[in-house]
């Protein structure tokens, strides 16, 4: 093997795909360029003995990690890289030679001139008295089974060893008990993963349990949870959802559960929760039991001796957490008040699924019924239909075979109506068109009356033109009695041509006879 492959940094760069896979398994992201820069240029300046070619010496890695994780003057961007270095040293891959595993770096604590120590940082959160309710006795660690050492010649603390109380690594440094004992210039919680029970290595046996290490909740987490959630009496859903999530993700111990109850709930709320939880302890038949010995065994009020590194201890903790969540849900119920359930109405822009969730939460809070049970599906469905928005309610009531629809089917039908609703722009355009159509209908009678008036005026003007001898009108006249019109040289009296009526000889003869008769 050449010289280039004998240094830790060259080994990691030559097997970068394996290193990156290791980082992904640790839920962190690393870059090859930064990996080389931190190892060869940045960490050697910390003055803890880190060589530019890198090292797998755990004592040096822990020293660098302490500086990286410092609250004041730390290096958050370097956290993923030193975490992966530590994992490579604790769980070396096959391509790491034995000589690299046992390499010893001398003078690991030589200070570097020109790097003054950072001043102590003032506390972020106020020192409230409610965070000290369980300060005595301090949170355990319970006795943890240590994994076997990596190699007989390995130097540095084993991976499963509990940190010393004077070394404020890990989330415990943020708690009040650790903060009181830790020196001011050495504070810095390890915030990589803050879990009360954290896996610290591979199982001691091929089919054994993964060993867990205890890390108590930090005061910052407790303060944030208390400040950012309404009280349990005001809105039980907030804290119930929080604790249900914590029971699944953080795997709290019995002491952690008591600390959460002390910090987040009042005395009356805490008593109700514990009482409801003990009512929900399941017996051997899977139904709630009333046997005192089984209740005390599954949900003890005094601190039990459960070892979380054994299968029996983990099972006990799992049952305890599940029972505590059942107690939270039971204590969240109020006296039966169906009027409160009927007050839950769907908002104008509220999705049907969100409305259904609010409706079911009202059932859980104000009725003794479980809305998700099979027997309550019909009641919840009728309430969902009757209290939906008007357009959705109208659609659901017209469905054929409504009694055969499940709650999920009703939500799907409601979603169709909800997503077919017009947008704000479409609504404005529709209202504009409706207003224009209404204006046209209102103006239509006026236009009709105006047309009649204009027709009458035109007719009157035509009549006036005929009376004044308008030739154009005369030419267009047609005889009313059906007689043909006269020619221009035709007599109107005798109908002969060549003279007019005043010159008609027949008509003149008659007149002369009458005149002669008068003379006689």
From Swiss-Prot:
The record's annotation in Gene3D superfamilies points to: Gamma-retroviral matrix domain (1.10.150.180), Human Immunodeficiency Virus Type 1 Capsid Protein (1.10.375.10), Zinc finger, CCHC-type (4.10.60.10)
Bias class Pro residues marks the residues at: 137-151
Q: Which GO terms describe its molecular function?
A: RNA binding; structural constituent of virion; zinc ion binding
A single GO cellular-component term on record: host cell late endosome membrane
Q: Which regions are flagged for Polar residues bias?
A: 461-476
Give me the segments passing through the membrane: none
Ranges annotated as biased composition (Basic and acidic residues): 419-442, 478-489
Under the heading PROSITE patterns, the entry gives: ZF_CCHC
Listed PANTHER family: GAG_P30 DOMAIN-CONTAINING PROTEIN
Q: Which SUPFAM superfamilies match?
A: Retroviral matrix proteins, Retrovirus capsid protein, N-terminal core domain, Retrovirus zinc finger-like domains
Sequence motif PPXY motif, residues: 139-142
Q: What is this protein called?
A: Gag polyprotein
A Pfam family per the record: zf-CCHC
Residue intervals of every CCHC-type zinc finger in the record? 489-506
List every stretch annotated Disordered: 110-199, 419-489
Superkingdom classification of source: Viruses
Per the UniProt record, the site (Cleavage) maps to 125-126, 195-196, 454-455
PTM details?
RNA-binding phosphoprotein p12 is phosphorylated on serine residues.
Identify the residue span(s) of motif PTAP/PSAP motif: 116-119
